[in-house]
Amino acid sequence: MLKMGVVLFTFLVLFPLATLQLDADQPVERYAENKQDLNPNERMKMIMSALGQRRCCISPACHEECYCCQ
């Protein structure tokens, strides 16, 4: 009876745990790698926003993504 319990425990508990794929085993999808096909302006905007910096804009074109140079 003990041997049957060990066999059942092995196949019902340990075997599924061993075959379960954990989150750490998954490949990482990087945002920048997925965005390689962006044009340079969109890429620069993404990099600047990630760095927390804003670009300098000429006075009539100032908006929330940049600050006025003059």
Swiss-Prot record:
> What family is this?
Belongs to the conotoxin M superfamily.
**Keyword annotations:** Cleavage on pair of basic residues, Disulfide bond, Secreted, Signal, Toxin
List cystine links: C56-C68, C57-C66, C62-C69
- Its main subcellular localisation, reduced to a broad class, is secreted
The family database entries (Pfam families) matched by this protein are listed as:
Conotoxin
Kindly indicate whether the keyword Secreted belongs to this entry. Answer: yes
Q: Which residues cross the membrane?
A: none
The leader peptide range reads: 1-24
- Domain comment text? The cysteine framework is III (CC-C-C-CC). Classified in the M-1 branch, since 1 residue stands between the fourth and the fifth cysteine residues.
Q: In which tissues is it expressed?
A: Expressed by the venom duct.
Q: Which GO terms describe its molecular function?
A: ion channel inhibitor activity; toxin activity
Propeptide position ranges: 25-55
Q: What top-level branch of life does the organism fall under?
A: Eukaryota
Q: What is this protein called?
A: Conotoxin Lp3.2
Provide the protein's localization.
Secreted
> What InterPro entries does the annotation carry?
Conotoxin
Q: Name one GO cellular component term.
A: extracellular region
